[in-house]
């Protein structure tokens, strides 16, 4: 299954999964991907970041994608985030979680509880940090 998301004709996200369950007949409708999902996120410059997870659910009314289980996010800059759960707000193009994460950059390995970032990762922030990281003086 292949689900594309666009904004003003520009593709912002593409969700691919082997199986989709459509619950659009519910009052709070959603689409479930019980066999895992692969999500490509494109920023305004068409740079691609990728998220894979064991399970995903898309809440149609809110535009939130909830990815769970062995979530791995690879940014266009080759940074990697490991988490058990990660949310993507399609409207705000925002990624976030309040679960434990490990964020690996070219020079640092940062552990924390929570993560916030725009889809460009220009303001990626690991919350409640624990681990080694480099400080600019």
Model region roles, listed by residue range:
Residues 1-137:
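Mature-chain termini and adjacent capping regions
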């Amino acid at each position: 299954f292949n689900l594309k998301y666009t904004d003003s004709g520009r593709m912002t996200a593409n969700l691919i999964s082997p199986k989709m369950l459509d619950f659009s007949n519910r009052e709070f409708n959603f689409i479930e991907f019980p066999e895992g999902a692969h999500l490509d996120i494109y920023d305004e410059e068409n740079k691609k970041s990728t998220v894979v997870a064991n399970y995903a659910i898309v809440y149609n009314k809110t535009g939130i994608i909830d990815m769970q289980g062995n979530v791995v996010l690879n940014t266009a800059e080759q940074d990697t985030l490991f988490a058990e759960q990660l949310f993507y707000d399609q409207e705000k193009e925002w990624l976030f979680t309040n679960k434990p994460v490990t964020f690996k950059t070219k020079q640092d390995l940062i552990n924390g509880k929570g993560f916030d970032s725009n889809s460009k990762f220009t303001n990626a922030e690991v919350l409640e940090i624990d681990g080694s990281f480099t400080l600019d003086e």
